[in-house]
Design a protein with these regions (language model features):
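N-terminal alpha-helical "arm" segments
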Residues: 1-27
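Short secondary-structure junctions
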Residues: 4-9, 35-43, 208-217
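A short, structural micro-pattern
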Residues: 15-18, 45-48, 87-89, 238-240
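N-terminal low-complexity, intrinsically disordered segments
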Residues: 18-83
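Short beta-strand-to-loop capping motifs
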Residues: 25-28, 97-99, 185-188
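Structural alpha-beta junctions
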Residues: 42-50, 113-127, 203-212
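Internal, hydrophobic cores of structured domains that mediate oligomerization or house catalytic pockets
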Residues: 56-158
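Aromatic/basic-lined ligand-recognition segments
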Residues: 132-255
Length: 255
């Protein structure tokens, strides 16, 4: 096998956190695991990651677990073709585990390639519960084929009104062993600016940066005295992760 490209973390600082992986792949499991390392950029299944299969005779309720509720209803509305394919499946694989504060992103490169291989073997759809993100084969392939790591594609930014202001927050950074992000109390006209700020922090953290408690944010056009505050817990339903609250200094709801 030719040498694979390293996915580095140039900003890495030890955090003591674990990268937590959770994917559900719907469709018939492959009969053999003959993955071409050079084609899919896979050197192996990362240590700490396990793959379990479920179907009609093995905990069939697990296959149906994510085919209900708000996220499923949203998928039916937004991506009916993908929802139809997933709904027909009676088997799935769950890819799950954790890695202690990885120094590189090679584990994630391996996972991206593994899931691409599963799609090429007939898997019909993949759900990322950490990011609340459903993937079709075409969408995953678009990311897989990109020349860069496309890490932002694996983290979602959600926005919603709150107390007459806006709230933006992420889901999905747990797969990189870093806190998710939240900005509350900004005016709606600043949504694009806040999105750019969040994307900057997503990239830094995915590449290994650790944002310290009280980190000040000084950017042109933003309020003075903005800073970062670590909050939450891994079972927080809004994030399924701990998070960093970016305090918008003159808001009513972020403090």
């Amino acid at each position: 096998m030719s040498e694979l490209t390293d996915w580095g973390r140039p900003y890495f600082e030890a955090s003591g956190s674990s990268a937590d992986i959770f994917y559900v792949a719907y469709g018939k499991p492959p009969s053999s695991w003959d993955i071409s390392g050079s084609k899919y950029s896979v050197s192996g299944i990362p240590d700490g990651i396990e793959i379990h299969t479920y179907g009609p005779t093995t905990h069939p309720e697990t296959v149906e677990e994510f085919k209900k509720g708000y996220l499923w209803e949203s998928l039916l509305e937004r991506k009916p073709d993908l929802a139809s394919k997933v709904a027909e499946q009676t088997e799935c694989l769950i890819i799950r585990g954790s890695l202690n504060d990885p120094v590189t992103l090679n584990y994630f490169r391996n996972l991206v390639g593994l899931i691409q291989w599963l799609f090429d073997r007939g898997i019909q759809g993949v759900f990322d519960p950490h990011a609340f993100l459903w993937w079709s084969a075409e969408e995953w392939n678009d990311v897989f084929e990109k020349s860069d790591t496309a890490l932002h594609s694996h983290v979602m930014i959600f926005t919603s009104p709150e107390n007459g202001e806006e709230w933006a927050h992420t889901r999905g950074l747990r797969k990189f062993g870093r806190p998710d992000l939240s900005v509350r109390g900004y005016p709606v006209e600043r949504t694009t600016d806040v999105g750019n700020l969040i994307n900057r922090f997503i990239g830094m953290q995915a590449l290994g940066a650790v944002i310290p408690e009280g980190q000040e944010i000084k950017m042109q056009g933003f309020p003075s005295e903005m800073y970062c505050k670590h909050k939450g817990h891994l079972d927080d339903p809004d994030f399924n992760n701990v998070h960093i609250e970016i305090i918008w200094s003159n808001s009513k709801s972020s403090n």
